[in-house]
């Protein structure tokens, strides 16, 4: 009896170990990080998988706020100085999607490349 | 929004009893046509907003040429909350345009844009008419979903109005918008409105222009046509919004 319970318990553990990571990957999706330093985006080109929703984490390392802005991505998000923001983009068809920092549009330029 | 049709009825000398016994007309609460709200909030963003509605109904002189204007000042307090204060004026055609009510509005962004199948928010409104002891409060569920360049937005409002000279009542409104993101300066849309004794639908166009210094001007213009015999024939709406930091 005890052996049977032990086997079932092990089977349950193995089942959980196989399911949990798969679920985490499915729920999480790709994560891409972007930094704002001295009113510049780093990196200025982000390569993301096409036709997939992507979680973009933007860290604003400057002390002043910046606005991530892109009509092509249909996203607009103010990131306060010294803070971070999460922006979900996509699923995107293959192509290039420019974005800029609305508070410093001359310097803060970048693009998302979906491929 | 308070009932400008009710206000017009009061100002034009219609007996109160007549107003109370014409629920289909007066307590349509009427001006259901308004902007369709998205659920998003931008911290630090300030805005000046002017909204105008002009009703045309040749079959009903009491409603024909009714104008409602709203002037608002707003601010994004955080990445979740924004607030706006409005002054509301009405002009029944014969009477002078004057400020008749004020409204407080708070928007709560519930989810990150694009995180789920739809984006969600809540809008809270409280309006007080100056001349009469008349109030209205409403909570509106805001939902938005993208399908590529298409954007669908739904506003479902539950409101309660009360005052000495009106019958207190609950009311609901549904506002729907389907918009195509053609280009930033020009986006065509279709809107559909359902409220108590109102059904209307019609085309709307909108656009935005960006200025230097993170300033932008957004405009919306359209006409909503009544879909039944009770609803006004046309409701022309215009919105101009200046956003800055």
Annotate each PLM feature:
Chain B
Residues 28-245:
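Transmembrane beta-barrel domains of Gram-negative outer membranes and organellar outer membranes
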Residues 15-16, 26:
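Cleavable N-terminal signal peptides
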Residues 1-8:
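N-terminal secretory signal peptides that target proteins for export/translocation
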């Amino acid at each position: 009896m005890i052996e049977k319970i032990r086997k079932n318990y092990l089977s349950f553990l193995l089942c959980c170990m196989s399911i949990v990571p798969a679920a985490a990957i499915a729920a999480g999706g790709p994560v891409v990080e972007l930094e704002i330093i001295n009113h510049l985006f780093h990196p200025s080109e982000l390569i993301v998988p096409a036709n997939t929703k992507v979680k973009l984490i933007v860290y604003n390392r400057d002390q002043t706020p910046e606005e991530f802005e892109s009509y092509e991505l249909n996203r607009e998000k103010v990131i306060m100085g010294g803070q971070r923001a999460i922006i979900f983009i996509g699923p995107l068809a293959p192509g290039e999607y420019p974005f800029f920092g609305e508070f410093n549009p001359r310097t803060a330029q970048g693009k998302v490349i979906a491929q | 929004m308070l009932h400008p049709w009710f206000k017009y009825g009061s100002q034009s000398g219609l007996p109160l009893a007549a107003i109370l016994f014409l629920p289909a007309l007066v307590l349509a609460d009427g001006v259901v046509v308004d902007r369709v709200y998205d659920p998003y909030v931008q911290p630090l963003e300030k805005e000046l907003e002017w909204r105008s509605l002009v009703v045309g109904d040749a079959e009903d002189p009491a409603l024909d040429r009714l104008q409602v204007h709203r002037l608002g000042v707003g601010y994004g307090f955080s990445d979740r909350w924004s607030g706006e204060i409005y002054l509301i004026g009405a002009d029944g055609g014969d009477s002078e345009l004057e400020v008749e009510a004020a409204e407080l509005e708070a928007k709560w962004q519930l989810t990150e844009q694009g995180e789920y199948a739809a984006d969600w928010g809540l809008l809270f409104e409280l309006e007080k008419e100056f001349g009469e002891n008349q109030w209205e409060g409403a909570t509106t569920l805001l939902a938005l979903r993208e399908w590529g360049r298409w954007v669908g937005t739904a506003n479902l409002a539950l409101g309660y109005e009360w005052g000495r000279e009106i019958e207190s009542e609950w009311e609901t409104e549904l506002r729907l918008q389907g918009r195509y993101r053609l280009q930033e300066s020009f986006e065509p849309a279709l809107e559909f409105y359902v409220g108590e004794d109102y059904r209307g639908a019609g085309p709307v166009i909108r656009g935005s222009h960006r200025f230097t210094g993170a300033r932008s001007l957004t405009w919306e213009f359209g006409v909503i046509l009544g879909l039944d015999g009770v609803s006004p024939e046309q409701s022309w709406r215009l919105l101009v919004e200046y956003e800055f930091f």
